[in-house]
Amino acid sequence: MADKEALPKLREDFKMQNKSVFILGASGETGKVLLKEILGQNLFSKVTLIGRRKLTFEEEAYKNVNQEVVDFEKLDVYASAFQGHDVGFCCLGTTRSKAGAEGFVRVDRDYVLKSAELAKAGGCKHFNLLSSRGADKSSSFLYLQVKGEVEAKVEELKFDRLSVFRPGVLLCDRQESRPGEWLARKFFGSLPDSWASGYAVPVVTVVRAMLNNLVSPSSGQMELLENKAILHLGKDRDVPKL
C-alpha cells in the first residue's frame, strides 16, 4: 500500500491511463457510495453499471454513466456486458432473511462467481471483491462459508490483480432491514474508533480504501484487506467531492 502523502499523485497518474470500470451492485449501500466516489475522483474514462434494472439519477455528474441491464440467471447471454473493462468492482449481495438460504447462496456465490468468470474472459485485469470479516469456506455459518467459498473460487480465476475486502459491520443508514445489524451499527457507532476498529467500519471508509488501494502499486496478485487495514487505508480525507 502506498503512503498516504503519495495518493494525490497516484490518483493523477491513474487518471492518465484512461481506464474503464464496471460496478456490480451499484444499487446497494456500498455500491451507491462507490459510484459517487468514483465519479467525484474522476478516476476512469468510462464507468459502467451492470445490474438487473436500470437506475435513475438526477445529478448531472451521472449523465455519462453507462448501464447494462442483465438477467443474472442467464449471464452467459450477456457476456458482452463484461467485455472491455480494465477494472471491476463487485458489491453484489443479499441476505438469507430476504432471499432464503438458497437465494442467498445463488446471489452471493453463484452470481458473483459467474460475473467474475465473464469479467476475466472479457479482459478485466483488476477485480475488486467486497467480502466480509470472518469469511471462511470451512465455517459452520452459512454466510461466512459462502463468502469464503466465493473468495477461493475467484482467486482460482487468476486475475492479474485481485483485491478482496473483508469489512466488519458496515456503518450506514441501510434502507433494507437486516436483523441484528441495526443494533450492531448503533452499538459500534457509539464506540471510540480504537474499540470498534476490529468489528465495524463506515461504508464511505470501505469505498475510499478500495479506491486508494486501486491507485496504489500492487503488493501481489491477491490482496486481502481485513477491517483494520480498511480503516487505515480509507481514512484519507484528501479526496475530491462530487
Curated annotation (Swiss-Prot):
Region annotation Required for interaction with elongation factor EEF1A1: where it falls in the sequence: 2-25
Primary role: Represses translation by preventing reactivation of elongation factor eEF1A. May also inhibit nuclear import by competing with nuclear import substrates for binding to a subset of nuclear transport receptors. Has additionally been proposed to act as a redox sensor involved in cellular oxidative stress surveillance.
Phenotype upon gene inactivation: Mice are haploinsufficient for tumor suppression. 50% develop tumors within their second year. 30% of the tumors are hepatocellular carcinomas. Mice develop more cardiac hypertrophy and cardiac dilation following transverse aortic constriction (TAC) surgery.
Record keywords, A-Z: Acetylation, Cytoplasm, Disulfide bond, NADP, Translation regulation, Tumor suppressor
GO biological process: alpha-amino acid biosynthetic process; angiogenesis; apoptotic process; cell differentiation; positive regulation of programmed cell death; positive regulation of transcription by RNA polymerase II
Residues in the signal sequence: none
InterPro entries assigned to the protein according to its UniProt record, in alphabetical order: NAD(P)-bd_dom, NAD(P)-bd_dom_sf, Semialdehyde_DH_NAD-bd
Residues the entry annotates as binding NADPH: S27, G28, E29, T30, R52, R53, L92, G93, Y143, K147, L170, R178
Listed name of the protein: Protein HTATIP2
Subunit structure: Monomer. Forms homodimers during oxidative stress. Interacts (via N-terminus) with elongation factor EEF1A1 (via middle-region); the interaction is direct and competes with EEF1A1 binding to guanyl-nucleotide exchange factor EEF1B2, thereby inhibiting GDP for GTP exchange and reactivation of EEF1A1. Interacts with nuclear transport receptors XPO4, IPO5/RANBP5, IPO7, IPO9 and KPNB1 as well as GCN1L1/GCN1 and LRPPRC probably through their HEAT repeats. Binds NCOA5/CIA.
